[in-house]
């Protein structure tokens, strides 16, 4: 008999000892209202829980790069979302934010857990050409630029 698959949850991904457990919110509750517009309304209910990782890791790291959100999705995956200006001179900043979050999550994320999608959503006008060397840099870093809104197709 097969067990029903459980959705991925930020709560279940964090160790019991993690100091950031208390910051996890149901659904998109940890996502700032101004940033919810970057997630398509038709998929918002698919998120089990969320954490504002920018706030969670701010103390003592004011000058370090910080990725914005980690979301638990019903398709059994953890998804990192970064609303950020989409300019060519910001690509390295977004890549550095990913590297920083991976380090910041050390000791917080259970060993068997991993983030399956790293999504960059434009928080303003897109100022770099599609299919350019910049997208190659992002792809090599494991980050998908999704344009102005995270859609269902970005979650599969």
Regions of interest found by a model, annotated:
Residues 1-61:
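Acidic-basic catalytic patches of nuclease active cores, encompassing PD-(D/E)XK
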Residues 91-95, 131-132:
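Conserved strand-to-helix beginnings and helix N-cap segments that scaffold or border functional pockets
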Residues 69-71, 75-87:
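Conserved catalytic cores of phosphodiester-cleaving nucleases, focusing on short active-site segments
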Residues 83-92, 125:
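Short beta-strand-loop-alpha-helix junction that forms the active-site gateway
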Residues 62-66:
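Short, flexible loop/turn motifs enriched in small residues
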Residues 106-114:
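Short, flexible active-site-proximal loops enriched in glycine and acidic residues
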Residues 94-107:
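Short, charged, amphipathic alpha-helix that recurs within catalytic cores of restriction-modification
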Residues 4-12, 113-156:
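Domain-level recognition of nuclease-like catalytic cores that cleave nucleotide substrates
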């Amino acid at each position: 008999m097969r067990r029903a698959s459980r959705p991925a949850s930020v709560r279940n991904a964090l160790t019991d000892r993690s100091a950031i457990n208390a910051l996890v919110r149901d659904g998109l509750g940890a996502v700032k209202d101004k940033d919810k517009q970057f997630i398509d309304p038709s998929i918002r209910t698919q998120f089990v829980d969320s954490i504002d990782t920018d706030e969670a890791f701010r103390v003592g790291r004011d000058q370090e790069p910080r990725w914005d959100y980690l979301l638990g999705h019903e398709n059994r995956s953890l998804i990192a979302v970064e609303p950020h200006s989409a300019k060519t001179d910001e690509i390295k900043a977004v890549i550095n934010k990913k590297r920083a979050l991976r380090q910041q999550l050390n000791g917080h994320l259970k060993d068997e857990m991993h983030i399956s999608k790293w999504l960059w959503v434009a928080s303003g006008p897109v100022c770099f050409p599609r299919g350019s060397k910049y997208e190659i840099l992002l792809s090599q870093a494991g980050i998908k630029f999704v344009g102005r809104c995270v859609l269902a197709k970005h979650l599969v």
